[in-house]
Amino acid sequence: MARRLQDELSAFFFEYDTPRMVLVRNKKVGVIFRLIQLVVLVYVIGWVFVYEKGYQTSSDLISSVSVKLKGLAVTQLQGLGPQVWDVADYVFPAHGDSSFVVMTNFIVTPQQTQGHCAENPEGGICQDDSGCTPGKAERKAQGIRTGNCVPFNGTVKTCEIFGWCPVEVDDKIPSPALLREAENFTLFIKNSISFPRFKVNRRNLVEEVNGTYMKKCLYHKIQHPLCPVFNLGYVVRESGQDFRSLAEKGGVVGITIDWKCDLDWHVRHCKPIYQFHGLYGEKNLSPGFNFRFARHFVQNGTNRRHLFKVFGIHFDILVDGKAGKFDIIPTMTTIGSGIGIFGVATVLCDLLLLHILPKRHYYKQKKFKYAEDMGPGEGEHDPVATSSTLGLQENMRTS
């Protein structure tokens, strides 16, 4: 064992490998070698240089988004009467940024006041007062329990609560959606971006978009791909969803603005591409999107509110992109990497030549030569022994 370790250490410290060129005339190996080189060449030029633009340096963007909506809807509900809904009523938040909700449906509980009333059955069914612990609130409770068990209707008793009364009953969602006119609402998106590395600024209001064009255009992916005014119904359909079913229970839609800019060309060719995605599946564990808000007012000296459970479409505007421009450093790096990849052809052909072909032992004999230090002067009388010509006394050690 010690002898073997000594031999290994001796070989590691006192042996040296140097490449040896051998010209092999073999059609199979020659064809495979050139085919591999061709594949590498196509990869380097086609994929790395042309598609991935390996000759460019890149910059990420910083972005700002603002939106405006337009449209009106009318409802006629008991307790509220006829009502016109404009953008100040159905958009949350009202100032409009990259994430907002358009209300399309709702359940209203009008004229609520602070007082005592029976809890909703979801908040706690009871048989007598012993089932209602005073001061306690269940997970779905709408108030604080008083400790009394009172009739909710003719068949069910629930715990009495102190809270906003009457309690909300939200088990019947209006169908069709109350604000179905939302399908025809329009959305105007303003997007400003900057590529700080190249000091380039752009807006989605590009050169082709002017005041006259904006007054009459609506976005269409083929006819008007640069128009920044969108029909909500079109956006939802392009996301792969049905507007009417989405409007009833709500949902989430993503709008992606993609900037892929080649700054080796004029900056006017840097234009946005819009894409639309449905972010919630219909078979989700918790489908739809909803939240609550209240309108507070004072009537006859009493604080009152209208409670709304809102179902709406949550729009998220996501901006992504990258700009590239020629740079000598990544160009030389890519060229060097490509040249290095050509070595794969040599490795694979050596593997084929020395380990797979029937004459592999013969090729190994021609490929590798073992030379040992024989001391000063030894072997100098035989110039053939130091020759690198194939076929002339190459097996010095074994002959």
Swiss-Prot record:
Membrane topology classification: Multi-pass membrane protein
Keywords assigned: Apoptosis, ATP-binding, Cell membrane, Disulfide bond, Glycoprotein, Ion channel, Ion transport, Ligand-gated ion channel, Membrane, Nucleotide-binding, Phosphoprotein, Receptor, Transmembrane, Transmembrane helix, Transport
Region (Pore-forming motif): 331-338
Binding site for ATP: K70, T186, S286, N290, R292, K309
Region entry Disordered, spans: 374-399
Biased composition (Polar residues): 385-399
Extracellular side: 51-338
Keyword Phosphoprotein: yes
Location relative to the cell: Cell membrane
One of the Pfam families matching this protein, by short name: P2X_receptor
Major location (coarse): membrane
Residues spanning the membrane: 29-50, 339-358
Regulation of this protein's activity per its record: Activated by low concentrations of ATP (<1 uM). Undergoes rapid desensitisation. Sensitives to the ATP agonist:alpha/beta-methylene-ATP. Modulated by cholesterol.
PANTHER family xref list: P2X PURINOCEPTOR (PTHR10125), P2X PURINOCEPTOR 1 (PTHR10125:SF9)
The family this protein is said to belong to: Belongs to the P2X receptor family.
Name of the protein in question: P2X purinoceptor 1
Organism: Rattus norvegicus
Organism lineage string: Eukaryota, Metazoa, Chordata, Craniata, Vertebrata
Gene name in the database record: P2rx1
